[in-house]
Regions:
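Bacterial N-terminal signal peptides
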Residues: 8-19
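A non-catalytic alpha/beta surface segment that caps or lines the substrate-entry region
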Residues: 38-102
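Structural recognition of the beta-strand scaffold that forms the well-ordered cores
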Residues: 96, 107-110, 159-162, 200-206, ...
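Active-site-adjacent substrate-binding region
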Residues: 55, 76-78, 82, 208-315
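Boundary at the C-terminal end of the N-terminal hydrophobic targeting segment
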Residues: 22-28
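Stable alpha-helical elements in mature extracytoplasmic
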Residues: 32-40, 55, 59-66, 136-142, ...
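Acidic/histidine-rich catalytic neighborhood of metal-dependent amide-processing enzymes
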Residues: 127-226, 250, 257-258
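Acidic/histidine-rich, surface-exposed loop or edge segments in extracytoplasmic proteins
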Residues: 36-49, 212-216, 282-283
Length: 315
């Protein structure tokens, strides 16, 4: 989960294409919180998933297979960082899933899929086992369920990006947001050459499974003039759907993956996050702290919002 840190990364680029089949034929009726909860539990059954670990590799394979089966075009964006404890290289890999890749103008939906190496805020076991059910699996679970609907989305194309190394940290001063920073730099470089997709906006899903869900507007997302309309449009959809857990007032100012996306990539990105979570960075961040109802409310809002996005103007 997010915190304020300086960003440093030693990178070696490797891009791995993992192609997907044709899109699924029939679109389901509505977002299922129960299915999303099943996905969350399946991800957590992999165990702790810190960057560079065998469990992270297994999770990545599981997710690639899931999104391929749903009709997404799946690819990996790989690079390396140096382990600040040993100096040895660590494999980092963002997972990218594209829907309707022929559409140049696109919307970015993102989440991080790594878990913190240790539950360092746990008062009893700060070097214990950290599952990251809410902080690591909840945003992923929402995207896994949203995948069922992407073939039928009109308007701009949609990319899912699962960021690695959001919190590959062991001590104060270690850098955060390495995956999103790398992604933003690669995107910015492509835009300078007028290559690749053009992102209209982005939405970051982080810690959205809390059974006591309260999603306030994140202060940075509201304060940035280019991002405020994204925030307002999502909360308007939530109000129409009667999802009261989306509270239309700002509360926390949070450093998260949306910061490099906006500052480096120039992608106006809104952070959807419930930061009032007592189990944050503790051994208690388990599926029992999450609920299908919460995942369902977030997923239905994002799906309805996506369906309302206008088509790109013809050129």
């Amino acid at each position: 989960m997010p915190n304020a840190r300086s960003l440093f990364v030693f990178v070696v680029l490797t891009t791995i294409a993992i192609t997907g089949p044709a899109a699924a034929a029939a679109e389901p009726a509505d977002f299922s919180g129960e299915r999303a909860m099943e996905h969350l539990e399946a991800v957590c059954q992999v165990g702790p998933r810190p960057s560079g670990s065998e469990a992270m590799r297994r999770q990545r394979a599981l997710l690639a297979e899931h999104f391929r089966a749903a009709g997404g075009a799946v690819s990996g964006q790989a690079f390396r960082i140096r382990d600040r404890r040993t100096g040895s290289p660590v494999h980092i890999e963002n997972l990218l899933i594209s829907w309707h890749p022929d559409r140049r103008e696109r919307i970015l939906l993102a989440a991080h899929y790594d878990t913190r190496p240790y539950p360092d805020r746990d008062p009893f076991d700060p070097r214990g086992r950290f599952i990251g059910a809410n902080d690591g699996a909840s945003g992923v679970a929402v995207l896994m369920e949203l995948a069922r609907f992407m073939a039928g989305i009109e308007g701009p194309g949609v990319d899912f990006v699962l960021f690695d190394a959001e919190e590959y940290v062991f001590a104060a001063g270690d850098p955060y947001f390495l995956g999103s920073t790398y992604f933003a730099r690669q995107y910015a470089a492509a835009r300078r050459k007028e290559e690749g997709p053009v992102y209209r906006c982005g939405v970051l899903l982080d810690m959205v499974g809390d059974r006591d869900l309260e999603i306030w507007q994140e202060r940075r997302s509201v304060s940035w003039p280019e991002t405020r309309p994204v925030v307002e449009s999502i909360w308007e959809v939530a109000a129409r759907l009667g999802v009261r857990e989306f509270i239309p007032r700002p509360r926390h100012e949070i450093d998260d993956d949306h910061v490099p996306l906006r500052n480096i990539g120039k992608i106006p990105t809104c952070d959807i996050i419930d930061f009032d979570y007592p189990a944050w960075h503790t051994t208690r961040d388990t599926p029992e702290q999450c609920s299908a109802e919460s995942l369902g409310k977030v997923g239905r809002v994002i799906l309805a919002w996506l369906r309302e996005q206008p088509e790109a103007p013809s050129r």
